[in-house]
């Protein structure tokens, strides 16, 4: 299937989002669609699949002009869209999610062919390297496993074109390798992939070509063998952003945080490590190793069953997030939309949530203090929005992440825990988040950064804590850390 989109325009409430955008993909091609958050990538694909109606321009498929009325019509034609936000119903089984709307039944009885659906689901997932029971509840799976279910659902529609919006954001390196194997197999069979991602290494590894949008406009198209990382970044942001990871200039001094023999039954055991003032401690490991569980215990979401926590040399009890906040510990979770933000609230309201005490006069929330705090934080973190009253659900991924970080900066954290801080964030916003981390450590605070992106771990960390199956696999100094040494420890080696 060959698709060509020409001069596509779209505005929301009079604000242009796409201006004469273009995109073309050939049969069997893996084509990256890149641009900063808010560049119009997802909007362009939603126009292709009938989610949005275009204001202008043409779409031709195999030489015939076409317009889809809705996503179902596009899917029936052979175009599937796997969105960044997972479309998984946690209370349904794996098989029920995969067959939703396409259930197998015994004739017209309405009775489901459950055993057959379970078997097909298991087979499809096994081909993607995921071995789970079709009868298992989807909510019991990790985010990465749920992402693979989404991919399998798209493959089950016999799609000729599969649009993937940040498909690997929650996948481990092994799962990504499995996905790429599947993509390479399908491209040989004539299936095309639109690959929306901010992960440069992946794009240069799996894609044939790149189309770049900036501020809703078409910037250009490049063949992968004929371009470079620097050229793509420059085309995306309209300028050179310099080194990918900013230089670290902080002075590392005394131990600010220590966990001794921390244990949470069924999650992790006998975990011991320290973090020092001015330090960024990277935390690496395979998905399900227990990295996030350890961070949740530090913040009091899931208190330790046994073990000790020390802050500045003093033992403290952290049995709830309130206890953690009193110790000036902040935690930015991996799932900003369900755990880090109230999407229907404004930027101002989200920023105020953990800072009600400092923004109040007496027992009354001060509108003046709230407005000033919002303005200061938006300026400090370069949050791009019309005003502090804009709903966070309407912000790009990068700006949403900045709001999450901003609200916690209000407590002046001495320890900031970041779980997958740049997931789904464009290269420009990533650089800004890295700069915020550096600024905190230069002021003598400490950062723990959990990340599945090994280049990020290596580029930003002073030391790397590697977790393997709920235990400390090892701790690497900066000059010892490499992708190979981290993966060796993460998989149980030495």
Swiss-Prot record:
The complex is composed of an ATP-binding protein (RbsA), two transmembrane proteins (RbsC) and a solute-binding protein (RbsB). It catalyses: D-ribose(out) + ATP + H2O = D-ribose(in) + ADP + phosphate + H(+). This is Ribose import ATP-binding protein RbsA. Gene3D superfamilies: P-loop containing nucleotide triphosphate hydrolases (3.40.50.300). GO terms for molecular function: ABC-type D-ribose transporter activity; ATP binding; ATP hydrolysis activity. It is found in: Cell membrane. It is an enzyme of class 7 (translocase). Residues 3-240, 250-494 form the ABC transporter domain. InterPro entries: AAA+_ATPase, ABC_carbohydrate_import_ATPase, ABC_transporter-like_ATP-bd, ABC_transporter-like_CS, P-loop_NTPase. It comes from the Bacteria. The lineage of its organism: Bacteria, Bacillati, Bacillota, Bacilli, Bacillales. Its EC number is 7.5.2.7. It is a peripheral membrane protein. Belongs to the ABC transporter superfamily. Ribose importer (TC 3.A.1.2.1) family. SMART domains: AAA.
């Amino acid at each position: 299937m060959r698709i060509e989109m020409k001069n596509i325009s779209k505005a929301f409430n009079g604000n242009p989002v796409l201006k004469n955008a273009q995109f073309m993909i050939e049969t069997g091609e893996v084509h990256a669609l890149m641009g900063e958050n808010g560049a119009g990538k997802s909007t362009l694909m939603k126009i292709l699949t009938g989610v949005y109606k275009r204001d202008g321009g043409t779409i031709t498929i195999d030489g015939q002009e076409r317009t889809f009325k809705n996503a179902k019509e596009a899917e029936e034609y052979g175009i599937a869209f796997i969105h960044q936000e997972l479309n998984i119903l946690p209370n349904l089984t794996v098989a029920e999610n995969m067959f939703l709307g396409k259930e197998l039944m015994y004739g017209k009885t309405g009775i489901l062919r459950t055993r057959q659906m379970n078997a097909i689901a298991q087979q499809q997932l096994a081909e993607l390297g995921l071995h789970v029971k079709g009868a298992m509840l989807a909510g019991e799976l990790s985010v990465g496993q749920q992402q693979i279910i989404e991919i399998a659902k798209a493959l089950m529609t016999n799609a000729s074109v599969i649009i993937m919006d940040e498909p690997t954001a929650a996948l481990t390196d092994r799962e990504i390798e499995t996905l790429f194997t599947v993509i390479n197999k399908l491209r040989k069979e004539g299936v095309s992939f639109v690959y929306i991602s901010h992960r440069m290494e992946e794009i240069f590894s799996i894609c044939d070509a790149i189309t770049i949008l900036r501020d809703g406009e078409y910037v250009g198209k490049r063949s992968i063998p004929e371009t470079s990382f620097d050229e793509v970044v420059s085309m995306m942001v309209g300028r050179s952003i310099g080194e990918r990871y900013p230089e670290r200039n902080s002075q590392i001094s005394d131990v600010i945080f220590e966990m001794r023999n921390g244990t949470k039954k069924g999650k992790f055991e006998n975990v011991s490590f320290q973090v020092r003032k001015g330090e960024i401690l990277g935390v690496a490991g395979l998905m399900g190793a227990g990295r996030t569980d350890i961070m949740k215990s530090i913040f009091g979401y899931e208190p330790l069953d046994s073990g000790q926590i020390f802050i500045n040399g003093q033992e403290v009890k952290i049995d709830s997030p309130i206890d953690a906040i009193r110790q000036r510990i902040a935690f930015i979770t991996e799932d900003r939309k369900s755990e880090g933000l109230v999407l229907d609230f404004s930027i101002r309201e989200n920023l105020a949530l953990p800072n009600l005490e400092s923004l109040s006069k007496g027992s009354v929330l001060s509108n003046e203090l709230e407005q000033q705090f919002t303005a200061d934080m938006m300026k400090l973190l370069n949050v791009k929005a019309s005003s502090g009253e804009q709903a966070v659900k309407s912000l790009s991924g990068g700006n949403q992440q900045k709001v999450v970080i901003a609200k916690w900066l209000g407590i002046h954290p001495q320890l900031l825990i970041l779980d997958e801080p740049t997931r789904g964030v464009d290269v420009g916003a990533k650089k800004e988040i890295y700069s915020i981390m550096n600024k905190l450590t230069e002021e003598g605070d400490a950062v723990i950064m959990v990340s599945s992106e090994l280049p990020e771990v290596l580029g930003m960390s002073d030391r790397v804590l590697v977790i393997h199956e709920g235990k400390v696999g090892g701790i690497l100094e900066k000059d010892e850390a490499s992708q190979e040494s981290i993966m060796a420890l993460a998989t149980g080696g030495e």
